UniProtKB/Swiss-Prot annotation:
A Gene Ontology cellular-component term: plasma membrane
EC number(s) recorded for this UniProt protein: 2.3.1.275
InterPro entries in UniProt: G3P_acylTferase_PlsY
MF term (GO), any: acyl-phosphate glycerol-3-phosphate acyltransferase activity
The name this protein goes by in its record: Glycerol-3-phosphate acyltransferase
Record flagged with keyword Cell inner membrane: yes
Amino acid sequence: MLSNLMSWQITLQIALAAAVIGYLLGSIPFGLILTRAAGLGDVRSIGSGNIGATNVLRTGNRKLAAATLLLDALKASAAAWIVGYFLGEEAAIIAGFFAFIGHLFPVWIGFKGGKGVATYIGTLLGVAPIMVVLFAAVWLAVAVTTRYSSLSALVAMLVIPVALLILGNEKVAAVMAIMTVISYWKHRANISRLMGGTESKIGAKG
């Protein structure tokens, strides 16, 4: 996979343009914008302090959390689609990756963003859409079995690069593998709680 990353034909100028566009789109903090617009205050002051959909759900507004999830996914998809249309497939992959980075480390709010699950899915939708079906299937299977949302996402993110590699899509597999590693790092507190048996389950109160 690493050798495939080195064999890309994209020029430095196009790669930089794709990265900047992707990052700026990914940096839009929809969770924060929506909760403030709804009069629910600063989502960073509750729960985990995260701007993602899971923390928005802690406000008690399910519709707002769903909207956050959708918009956080679509900003990565939009980055890949727009850049891909004008600059090509490799640029689309780069744009999706940097939209993911932008969500995790948004320039507008001090580089403190989400954990990247929604933008991971959005990037998949933009560059390898059939893989979204696999992600959803794995997530659902693990969630039904364990009732851990975080574990479901972690397992799904582990499966995706392997599946892409098996299917011969090595460029996307390599990038998604890097995104998986980064998201695992962002989920390190969840992983610690999972190992300690203290992670909250889906539907748990308090």
